[in-house]
UniProtKB/Swiss-Prot annotation:
Compartmental location: Cytoplasm; Nucleus
Family the entry assigns: Belongs to the ubiquitin-activating E1 family.
The UniProt record lists the keyword Membrane: no
Additional remarks: There are two active sites within the E1 molecule, allowing it to accommodate two ubiquitin moieties at a time, with a new ubiquitin forming an adenylate intermediate as the previous one is transferred to the thiol site.
Catalytic residues (UniProt): C598
Gene: UBA1
Record organism: Candida albicans (strain WO-1)
Residues engaged in binding ATP: R22, A442, D468, R479, K492, V518, D542, N543
Catalytic activity: ATP + ubiquitin + [E1 ubiquitin-activating enzyme]-L-cysteine = AMP + diphosphate + S-ubiquitinyl-[E1 ubiquitin-activating enzyme]-L-cysteine
Pathway: Protein modification; protein ubiquitination
Protein name per its UniProtKB record: Ubiquitin-activating enzyme E1 1
Class of this enzyme: ligase
SMART domains listed in its UniProt record: UBA_e1_C
Coiled-coil features, chain-numbered ranges: none
GO molecular function annotation: ATP binding; ubiquitin activating enzyme activity
């Protein structure tokens, strides 16, 4: 045994939320703490082994140990991104250790010098790759008997195999990782039928469990015991209750309860004979059984040939391996059942057995690492028990790239693993691609690593362009694995480019990294010349707006686009091919449900509502009001200008008056301000609401006003010993001091207490005539009335009370920009406190800063495993794009959820077809192309004569250049103008010099005089 195992180190430290922030939102604290107690061993440090190790190290287990004494060879460099030519001959595990250790300082990386039983028993989970079937059985017999998780995985070219065994009894605490469902009850019948309020869907399934709270008339139901659900429909479910539960009066909330589930796994020896498969592609339902025999046949071949696999595309070797598959099928006929062995399909596996494809490695590496995390944390449902996969559609066309023993033999290159599958000519094609990667965050880093292994862009004609205008933050390090702690603050694209050039020196000088955001404002940088040189565009973005823009450019320049995204354990990939598929923008997600205005202002019933209210309060206090003050101080005629645009001018001016006439001069003043605001928001405003709508108020129909989603609030009495009350004061005072540029003393809690004791609070006086909207319709009506009833006299009065800007020359406030990831800036502290105080008003369960940050910061949960997997799938599509496949059935859009686990594929949707005058056109990809800066008359004549179309309207951007209903003189004046002159005359702007294409939209009639939809016009200057 080596002495550096550190297996019995003390219990894990607290979770570093700065580092693991995004992953915590995927796994939760409980699962993370379990992982930090788990020791993991990886046997086999080829490309797949290192990919799994990388993902596990980033995720944060207690320790990660490696075993692979085999010496490094040149072919390892096909996918082993932490090895280089200088390490050839060294043991793989020793050579990989240091680079793995850099990924996460919380995870010690050890090398073990044997894998006897004593060593294996030290681990919670063991992964093996690339070992003999005999060794797998030996290891699994030990792990199964001792309840140690065991995963074996193998990759052969475009094929892959996973086996999972987590022992006789493995408990899954949370099968899906989804937030527990909850809702408001409108009725519970005596037979146990529960009905939802206001046609809200409950989303539950048969067998789910729920608990209840706040049900009036049924105290026994509120005791918190889980009840099993029988679904009656989308708006009702049934639970078992008897007469002892009492009779329903009103109210009630239900919340789903996650019930642990026990799973039982069989050892490898049993599963070899009677396998249980997870299907990865429903179009290949019969393939797992074929591959189950095929992979065993390869082990039989290796046994006969001293561990050697069949040579690439060697017919003799493939025939021998197929013979072993036939013998296995005869020995165990139940595996194939009625089916026959598919010789053509299995020979493809044998031909490719020495292949090592970066895309398959990334896909499987993400998948397997997530299985390890499931074993260590008991969170999410594991694979039972085999998963087979192939991506034969990625093979290039036989006619252009023939695959045979000569073309696919190794050439002593780092790309031999890829050449073994695709051949030398296709490898050259990959090397000479020009590819644009938009974004170098989590997906971008993984993509670049895959491309470095593929040799993409490394040839004489090749080039990789990257752009990202973001810099590296600590929370990125947990999944953007090309970055290290020393890189925090640097530009993502530059650091990523340097990192992959070290992985593959062939990329030196082949990467052009930019810091520019891709958008309309940078079309002079990403111009015609830039776009036309590209072969493929790949998105690695995290927002819809940027994705849509890149998609539009790809459609315009007719460039293939590979798109992907992740959300926690969910991921998707989409391939967009010119003149074949629809584009990214063709389909859209449904819009997010917004919180009704009256719910936000007066009737919250969920913590999400109070967090949204608190974020809005933060923006109002510390961003919008200071910005209004600065505009007033810097803009002449501010009041007159604002009157025209802002219906709530009165509220805006009152705020400016408060911020200038009552400005604080000391930090003590800031504390007093925060205390007064506490009283206003959490006491007086609540008392006013109850004055307008007393607890016993009734609606116009005689029903109780405070029922259903409306919860009657209680005013808060300030309590200095309540953490949320005090945090509101501390956060508020510090933020106010910041906007006024006051020095913030390092005030202690005692300092705050001293000042707070001196604050005099006026008692609440109810105001009559205060309108509070009880419904959204009322809120909308009030907003409309606001814009229609501006009281000039009142506004003049407030405006007159404002100090003259000239008396405050040069004086400005500093508006605060919300930043969620800095725990020292009081932003999240203040929002959490404000949200929790409001939750206390309404009897809603409060949330910690971690949850508040997630909702207020709109954080996208993320984990390295999903990212790796998704980029692997993208690279498998990339091979198809390089080959120029024009059969839509060969392409796959991927949909995965590692938590379930679910892997599904579908064909892309074909681009829609349009028609005019019996001519067909592609509604997405086709356009009318004209050359030269012609006149408007020439353009109209061309369409009349060549296309049989009479143009009735012509527009450029937002400018209408021509319409048949224009006055004759206007039309006459414009017909003789060149298009660029016409644009200048109408829009009052020159066409920028970098613009080489003018895009016009038209409305027109066909030969029958009917209005028809046609493509846009592109005029090349």
């Amino acid at each position: 045994m080596s002495d550096n195992m550190q297996i019995d180190s003390p219990s894990p430290q607290e979770i570093d939320e700065g580092l693991y922030s995004r992953q915590l939102y995927v796994l939760g604290k409980e699962a993370m703490l379990k992982m930090q107690n788990a020791n993991v061993l990886i046997i086999g440090l080829n490309g797949l082994g290192i990919e799994i190790a990388k993902n596990i190290a980033l995720a944060g287990v207690k320790s990660l140990s490696l075993y692979d004494p085999k010496p490094v060879s040149i072919t390892d460099l096909s996918t082993q991104f932490f090895l280089s030519e200088s390490e050839i001959g060294q043991p793989r595990d020793v050579a990989s250790r240091e680079k793995l250790a850099e990924l996460n300082s919380y995870v010690p990386i050890n090398v073990v010098d044997n894998i006897d039983e004593e060593t294996l028993l030290k681990f919670k989970c063991i992964v093996s790759t690339n070992i003999s079937l005999e060794e797998q059985v030996k290891i699994n017999n030990i792990t199964h008997a001792n309840n140690i998780g065991y995963i074996n995985a193998d990759i052969k070219g475009l094929f892959g195999q996973i086996f999972v065994d987590f022992g006789d009894k493995f408990t899954v605490i949370d099968q899906t990782g989804e937030e527990p469902l909850s809702g408001i009850v409108s009725d519970i019948e005596k037979n146990g039928t529960v009905t939802m309020l206001d046609d809200n869907r409950h989303g539950l399934q048969d067998g789910d469990y729920v608990k209840f709270a706040e049900v009036e008339g049924m105290p026994k139901l509120n005791e918190g015991n889980p009840h099993k659900v029988e679904v009656l429909g989308p708006y009702a479910f049934k639970i078992k209750i008897d007469e002892s539960y009492g009779e329903y009066v009103k109210g009630g909330l239900y919340t789903q309860v996650k019930v642990p589930k026990d799973l039982s796994f069989e050892p490898l020896t049993k599963q070899l004979a009677a396998p249980e498969y997870l299907i990865s592609d429903f179009a290949k339902f019969d393939k797992p059984a074929q591959l189950h025999l095929g992979f065993q046949a390869l082990h039989a071949f290796q046994t006969k040939h001293q561990g050697e696999l069949p040579a690439p595309y060697n017919e003799q070797d493939a025939t021998e391996a197929f013979r072993y598959a036939e013998e296995l099928a005869t020995q165990n006929p139940s595996i194939l059942g009625e089916d026959k062995l598919d010789e053509k399909y299995l020979k493809e596996l044998f031909y490719q057995a020495r292949g090592d494809i970066p895309g398959v490695v990334a896909f499987y590496g993400g998948l397997i690492a997530q299985e390890v995390l499931k074993n260590c944390s008991s969170k999410f449902t594991p694979i039972k028990q085999w998963l087979y996969f192939d991506s034969l559609e990625s093979l290039p066309s036989e006619t252009e790239y023939p695959r045979n023993e000569e073309n696919n033999k190794p050439i002593g290159s780092r790309y031999d693993g890829q050449i073994a599958v695709f051949g030398k000519a296709f490898q050259e094609k990959i090397a000479n691609l020009k590819v644009f990667l938009v974004g170098s965050g989590a997906i971008g880093c993984e993509m670049l690593k895959n491309w470095a292994m593929m040799g993409l862009g490394s040839g004489p004609e090749g080039k990789i362009f990257i752009t990202d205008n973001d810099s590296i933050e600590k929370s990125n390090l947990n999944r953007q694995f090309l970055f290290r702690p020393k890189d925090v603050g640097k530009n993502k694209s530059d650091v990523a480019a340097l990192a992959v050039q070290q992985m593959n020196p062939d990329l030196k000088g082949k990467i052009d990294s930019k810091l520019d955001k891709v958008g309309p404002e940078t079309e002079d940088i990403f111009d015609d010349k830039f776009w036309t040189q590209l072969n493929i565009v790949v998105n690695a973005l995290d927002n819809v707006e940027a994705r849509t823009y890149v998609d539009r450019r790809c459609v315009f320049y007719k460039k293939p686009l590979l798109e992907s995204g992740t959300l926690g354990t969910k991921g998707n990939t989409q391939v967009v091919i010119p003149n074949l598929t629809e584009s990214y923008s063709s389909s859209q997600d449904p819009p997010e449900k917004s919180i009704p205005l009256c719910t936000l202002r007066s009737f919250p019933n969920k913590i999400d509502h109070t967090i949204a209210w608190a974020k809005s309060l933060f923006q109002g206090y510390f961003a919008e009001s200071p910005e209004s003050v600065n505009l007033y101080l810097s803009q002449p005629n501010y009041v007159e200008q604002t009157l025209k645009q802002n219906p709530d001018i009165k509220g805006t001016l009152e705020n400016i008056s408060k911020y200038l006439n009552n400005r604080p001069y000391t930090f003590e003043d800031c504390i007093k301000w925060a205390r007064q605001e506490f009283e206003t928001k959490f006491n007086h405003d609540i008392q006013q609401l109850l004055y307008n709508f007393p607890p016993d108020a009734k609606t116009s129909t005689g029903a109780p006003f405070w029922s259903g989603p409306k919860r009657a609030p209680k005013p808060l009495e300030f309590d200095i010993n309540n953490k949320d009350h005090l945090d509101f004061i501390i956060g508020g005072a510090n933020l106010l001091a910041f906007i006024y540029g006051l020095k913030e003393p390092n005030a202690t809690v005692d300092d705050f207490k001293k000042v707070l004791e001196q604050v005099i609070i006026e008692p609440f006086q109810p105001k009559s005539g205060v309108e509070i909207a009880a419904t959204d319709a009322e809120a909308e009506e009030q907003a409309n009335n606001l814009s229609g009833s501006i009281d000039d006299e009142q506004i003049r009065k407030i405006a007159a009370s404002l100090p003259e800007p000239s008396t405050l020359a040069g004086y400005r406030l500093t508006p605060i920009e919300f930043e969620k990831d800095d725990d020292t800036n009081h932003h999240i502290e203040f929002i959490t406190a404000a949200s929790n105080c409001r939750a206390l008003n309404y009897g809603i369960e409060i949330a910690d800063a971690h949850k508040t940050k997630f909702i207020a910061g709109k954080i996208i949960p993320a984990i390295a495993t999903t990212t790796a997997l998704v980029t692997g799938l993208v690279c498998l599509e990339l091979y198809k794009v390089v080959d120029g496949k024009d059969d839509i059935e060969q392409y796959k859009n991927g949909f995965i959820n590692l938590a379930l686990p679910f892997i599904g594929f579908s064909e892309p949707i074909k681009s829609p077809e349009g028609k005019y005058n019996n001519k067909k056109f592609d509604q997405i990809w086709d356009r009318f192309e004209l050359n030269g800066d012609i006149t408007l008359q020439e353009l109209l004549d061309h369409f009349e004569k060549e296309e049989g179309l009479t143009i009735s309207m012509l527009s450029y951007g937002v400018s209408l250049l021509y319409a048949s209903f224009f006055p004759p003189k206007k039309v006459k004046d414009r017909l003789g103008l060149k298009l660029t002159s016409l644009i200048k005359e109408v829009s009052k702007k020159e066409v920028p010099s970098h613009v080489k294409n003018l895009i016009f939209e038209i409305c027109c009639d066909d030969e029958e005089g009917e209005d028809v939809e046609v493509p846009y016009i592109c005029v090349k200057l």
